[in-house]
Amino acid sequence: MAYVNFGEDNQLPFNIIKMIGIDEVMSQNKLFNVITCYGAGLKYMDVDTRQPTTHPEIKRWLIHNSLPLFQLEQATDMKYFFFCVSVIILSRDGKRINRLIHKEACYCRFQQARRGKINHVIYANFRENASLRPEDYEVIRLLDPRDPLGDLMVLMGREPGRDGETRARTDDRKFAILVRFPTPGFQYYPIPYYTSIFRGDWYDIKRLIGKGKKAKLR
């Protein structure tokens, strides 16, 4: 299955991680942004009491899916790459969401769009362009980013599509959900605004100043 490279050599996300990691200010700024985005964490509130739910089934689902970790993972990818991917796994009868899983954005690639729509997310270890076998790729059906719930309802045969027809329920039970922060040009992979730092001169100058001072101390 053909996918779109993430950067010219398909290594852009790993290069971004490296460039942020070697800058002590930027890396701490990213941590601050993620923690701020996390805030007080996710809470499922009861509509009537306006307090965190005490419903045993809901509480069990929240615990088994580790929502605090999920939120931190999603926030981290959003702050680094301006997009994040999650996967929902339905029950066998297709009536419930059993699992909610985060997928690392740096290992996600998008299938080439057909008629303006991306139909699948490809998940694999693309680091250093490692040699991958067909079984190393996880191909996940992507729900419509603008209306994932509506798309899921149509695929499960619970609502008619835009053509007014109700389809037979799909056999798929695993679906990807994509959230992208809007950037000019609407590329496959957003170009975060902060990456202008790397395209300017001061990122390199700042590092050279540190190296120069270090050399004088020797």
Predicted regions and their residues:
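Structured, contiguous alpha/beta core segments that scaffold functional sites
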Residues: 1-22, 34-37, 41-218
